[in-house]
């Protein structure tokens, strides 16, 4: 963890998407190719579990997307169907969220060193991370799905422009993408979909899913907005 490798992060939303598509599709293809071999290998259980979790971690985006889509009709069912009390048992699944939150807290603590700085950075950035992760779930789930289907796609490199300070320019470069993918418009529709979930929560005065729907709405809206904005800047 102390080995530093200088690298340039994606400078625009379309560059980030091309990187994420390549990583997630490649991860799914790798899991498809050697997943069963790892499961059947004569390895200690802890190593096998670690390997399987690492190989199949890209499928998380599929489950994030499915969970998000189902959350809106579930809110309606919860408030319209009589004696539908199964939701009180669903809180056990929050354990997964606690594990993720703790993992990112520890990584922030290792970087920031002091508790005060860690809490300041963590409280402001972790919700943004969750929102962006949810907003990218449609795009990344599509990449994973195509990887599992074995569909061949072109290898699209992440654009690099040697951006080292705020004065460097990445806009209108030939290497940047200007074409708008149909998925972008779906992301815009999903932002409206989760906005309806927020409105429904206030209508029913049921705020249990409100933070989840607010993160989903914010994430999809941000991804949609910056995908369009950066495409127009590069056209």
Where do the language-model regions lie?
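Nucleotide-sugar-dependent glycosyltransferase catalytic core
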Residues: 7-26, 118-123, 127, 152-170
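Loop-to-transmembrane boundary segments
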Residues: 40-63, 163-195
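Membrane-embedded multi-pass helical conduit in multi-pass membrane proteins
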Residues: 57-154, 160, 181-235
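General secondary-structure edge motif
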Residues: 11, 36, 114-115, 121, ...
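Extended catalytic-interface subdomain
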Residues: 1-99
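Alpha-helix initiation/capping motif
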Residues: 1, 12, 141, 179-182
């Amino acid at each position: 963890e102390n080995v530093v490798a200088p690298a340039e992060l994606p400078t625009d939303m379309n560059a980030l998407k091309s990187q994420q598509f390549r990583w997630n599709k490649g991860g799914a293809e790798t899991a498809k190719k050697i997943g069963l071999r790892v499961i059947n290998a004569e390895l200690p259980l802890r190593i096998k579990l670690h390997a399987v979790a690492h190989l199949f971690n890209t499928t998380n985006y599929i489950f994030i997307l499915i969970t998000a889509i189902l959350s809106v009709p579930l809110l309606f069912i919860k408030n319209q169907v009589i004696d539908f009390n199964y939701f009180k048992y669903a809180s056990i699944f929050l354990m997964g969220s606690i594990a993720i939150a703790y993992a990112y807290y520890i990584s922030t603590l290792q970087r920031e060193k002091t508790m005060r700085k860690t809490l300041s950075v963590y409280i402001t950035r972790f919700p943004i991370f969750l929102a962006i992760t949810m907003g990218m779930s449609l795009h990344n789930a599509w990449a994973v799905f195509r990887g599992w289907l074995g569909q061949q796609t072109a290898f699209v490199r992440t654009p690099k422009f040697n951006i080292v300070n705020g004065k460097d320019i990445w806009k209108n470069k030939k290497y940047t993408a200007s074409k708008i993918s149909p998925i972008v418009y779906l992301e815009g529709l999903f932002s409206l979909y989760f906005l309806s979930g927020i409105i429904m929560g206030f209508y029913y005065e049921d705020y249990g899913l409100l933070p989840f729907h607010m993160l989903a709405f914010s994430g999809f809206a941000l991804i949609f907005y910056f995908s369009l904005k950066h495409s127009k800047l590069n056209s």
